[in-house]
Amino acid sequence: MLRFPQYHLLFGPVSINPEYGQASKELILSYLRHNRLADDLVPFVRAKNPPRAMSLHEADLDVLQRCAFDLEHVSGLVSDLEPDAKQVPVLLKHYLKLNGRLITFNVDDSFGGCLDGLIVVDLTKVDPKLLAAYLTEEGARSFLEYHDFHA
């Protein structure tokens, strides 16, 4: 990003391990679809193998969603649902803290049935202090100045 500051969009897959229970995956997926979907980009991408229809009853999912005000609540609910108390995947949390948005979801059978989300992060929309943690203060300042942002 420092060598080529004209590029400010990052995109790629972020995975939810198939070891997560179905209820946890559905809760995470539902939260992402309702709160972090890149609606403007959805029409341009189609998953080869989209996740099947949810197995949770709509009423059950609705109750879980009402308890999930933000990502930390979702993570806590997932931890309660999982036998080993794992939470929302760490990499996914990091991308979401960078204001990442999901475009579509795909089940990757060649990777053990992982649930993959195609995520996009616009680095010009990341909090400058958080950006500095990745690019250094000087790097973040230089990057943002290139894009006419003044932190």
How does the language model describe each region?
Residues 2-151:
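Terminal substrate-recognition subdomain of acyl/acetyltransferases
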